[in-house]
């Protein structure tokens, strides 16, 4: 997997409109995106993921998935399913409504790679700083 560091993708207009209509009071995922979105950038992971090859999923997006997964006490399979079917997760992750998401096996590989490089606390520490 290669990476070109960036921030979270912008929330697509249609995704935002549907999320706001379906959840007028918001949700945990929407609140995290709106108030803490700047924490979930690729930059802290720049040394862990290469720049060659086809781009992989954004480490910033995967770290946001991991935080939402923990907050909602979900398995990897359930978290990957939420990215496909839950409008508030699509909003938080900056996904189009028709986006088919990612395979659940990406999540344990992502966590293992962070642990391999001593970055398992990187997102948590950034959340505390924010």
Ranges and model annotations:
Residues 24-67, 71:
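Basic, short loop/linker segments at the boundary and entry of helix-turn-helix/winged-helix-like folds
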Residues 65, 79, 83, 103-107:
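Short, conserved catalytic/metal-binding motifs centered on acidic residues
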Residues 96-130:
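Active-site- or DNA-interface-adjacent structural scaffold in DNA-acting proteins
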Residues 87-98:
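Short, basic interhelical loop/turn and adjoining N-cap
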Residues 1-37:
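Charged, often Cys/His-bearing segments associated with DNA-binding zinc-finger transcription factors
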């Amino acid at each position: 997997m290669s990476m070109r560091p960036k921030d979270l993708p912008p929330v697509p207009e249609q995704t935002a409109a549907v999320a706001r209509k379906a959840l007028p009071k918001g949700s945990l995922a929407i609140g995290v995106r709106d108030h803490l979105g700047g924490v979930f950038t690729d930059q802290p992971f720049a040394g862990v993921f290469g720049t060659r090859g086809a781009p992989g999923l954004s480490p910033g997006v995967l770290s946001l998935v991991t935080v939402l997964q923990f907050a909602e006490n979900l398995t990897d399979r359930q978290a990957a399913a939420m990215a496909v079917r839950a409008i508030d997760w699509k909003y938080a992750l900056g996904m189009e409504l028709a986006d088919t998401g990612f395979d659940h096996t990406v999540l344990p590989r992502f966590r293992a790679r962070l642990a391999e490089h001593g970055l398992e606390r990187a997102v948590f520490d950034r959340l505390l700083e924010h």
